[in-house]
Curated annotation (Swiss-Prot):
One of its GO terms (cellular component) is cytoplasm. The gene is hisG. Belongs to the ATP phosphoribosyltransferase family. Long subfamily. Feedback inhibited by histidine. This is ATP phosphoribosyltransferase. Transmembrane segments: none annotated. It is found in: Cytoplasm.
Length: 289
């Protein structure tokens, strides 16, 4: 038996392949191929546009897939969310679907969009947001290059932004956020009800989420004199309690801890001053709580 899995082709492909590699899955794809090989005989991987994956999962063409919440909502796909995977093309943060207008536009708020023309790839999601805010505007589908359509072709756009740099480069300002979106591992309902496929998906989710957790953390090892241990422990942040091991024939102990990478820059000098020796920092592949 195989699990048929849809992965996004295009801007999110490289980040997705890197995540799968960290999780233990080697994906190899030939030029112009849409069917990568993978070092797991129980997986069949198909590359396609993220916009289409939820529809094919909903219809049962795929057992499961990775796509953003925005595209799941746009496709009105009735699927099972297996795991929330917070990563994007260039940052580890959620993306936003925003409404933006030209910097010099008279449009200041959502209510000013009444009777205006808006371009977007996410027509249904945008229309729903406008209805909920009592706005009657014309929403048209954009086939790409959405940012350049303001103000010459449309009054506003609803577009995905990760860092905001593209909007700024096109002299646009945000007047509203429609939603925040993260990548979802989602499954077809019938596939989810199959015990083998459910277990396979749950195992995949554990590995992918473990890989994402590891990206923000590192491990630290150090040797500490016994009389300095309490001082060292007082300044060590940790997921749980640090691991402490007595060194053979010594009054020293080995201390090991997992912590946020952003803490290391200030922590290592502090540990050294507090009496720690032989400090080693090492990367993590997966963190499974």
């Amino acid at each position: 038996m195989k699990l048929r899995l849809g992965l996004p082709k295009g801007s999110l492909q490289e980040a997705t392949f890197q995540l799968f590699k960290q999780a233990g899955f080697e994906l190899t794809v030939r030029s112009r191929s849409y069917f990568p090989s993978v070092n797991d005989p129980e997986l069949e991987v198909v590359l396609m546009r993220a916009q289409e994956i939820p529809r094919y999962v909903h219809e049962g063409v795929l057992d499961a897939g990775l796509s953003g919440l925005d595209w799941i909502l746009e496709n009105e796909a009735d699927v099972v969310e297996v795991a929330d995977l917070v990563y994007a093309k260039s940052t580890p943060n959620p993306i936003r679907l925003v409404i933006a207008v030209a910097n010099d536009s008279n449009i200041k708020s959502v209510s000013d969009l009444n009777g205006k023309r808006i371009a977007t790839e996410l027509v249904r999601v945008t229309q729903k947001f406008l209805r909920e805010n009592g706005v009657n505007a014309y929403v048209e589908y954009s086939y790409g290059a959405t940012e350049v359509k303001v103000p010459h072709l449309v009054d506003a756009i609803a577009d995905i932004t990760e860092t905001g740099s593209s909007l700024k480069a096109n002299n646009l300002r945000v007047i509203a956020t429609i939603l925040e979106s993260t990548t979802k591992l989602h499954a077809n309902k019938e596939s989810w009800n199959d015990p083998w496929k459910r277990e396979k998906l749950q195992n995949l989710a554990v590995l992918l989420q473990g890989a994402l957790r590891a990206r923000a953390r590192v491990g630290l090892k150090m040797n500490v004199p016994g009389d300095r241990l309490d001082t060292i422990l007082a300044i060590l942040p940790a997921m749980k309690q640090p691991t402490i091991s007595q060194l053979v024939n010594s009054d020293w102990v080995a201390v090991e801890v997992i912590l946020e990478e952003r803490q290391v820059r200030d922590l290592i000098p502090a540990l050294k001053r507090a009496g720690a020796h032989d400090i080693i920092e090492y990367p993590l592949t997966k963190v499974i709580p």
